[in-house]
Amino acid sequence: MKIDYTLYLVTDSHIVNRQELYKRVEQAILGGCTMVQLREKDISSLDFYRQALELKQITEKYRVPLIINDRVDIALAVKAAGVHIGQNDIPVSVVKDIIGRNMLLGVSVTSLNEAEQAVKDGANYLGVGAIFPTKTKKDAV
């Protein structure tokens, strides 16, 4: 499957509660979203897994890739299209060894050096740091 990175949605349950999440993700896909990343920092592994399963059904229905933030285990368990990691997570090369060539690997970077290293180590795409401050990224440039 050719991946379309045009409009990449990152979920945030601090902005949209869980009851609304599934409906909002489906609306986003119908509105042109081409990729969805499930990003949860404050829930249990079991809740994260259950949420991922629910979102996988929605994204699969529309043939939109589901990316799991930080959690390689959950990405593998739900057969997500890929995983997205940051600079303080397991090294890119190790994650790539775990997930293999058939899953996507995205990496958040904040410098040219980090970007070059991530690509060298096997990243399929890069997430470049926040430009404007948000509720979760107050130190944006």
Q: Each predicted region: which residue ranges?
A:
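Conserved N-terminal beta1-alpha1 strand-loop-helix module at the mouth
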Residues: M1-D89, D97-N124
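A short acidic, helix-capping loop that chelates divalent metal ions and anchors anionic groups
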Residues: A75, F132-K138
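Active-site phosphate/pyrophosphate- and oxyanion-stabilizing loops and adjacent acidic/basic residues
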Residues: S93
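Active-site-adjacent C-terminal substructures of enzyme catalytic domains
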Residues: V141
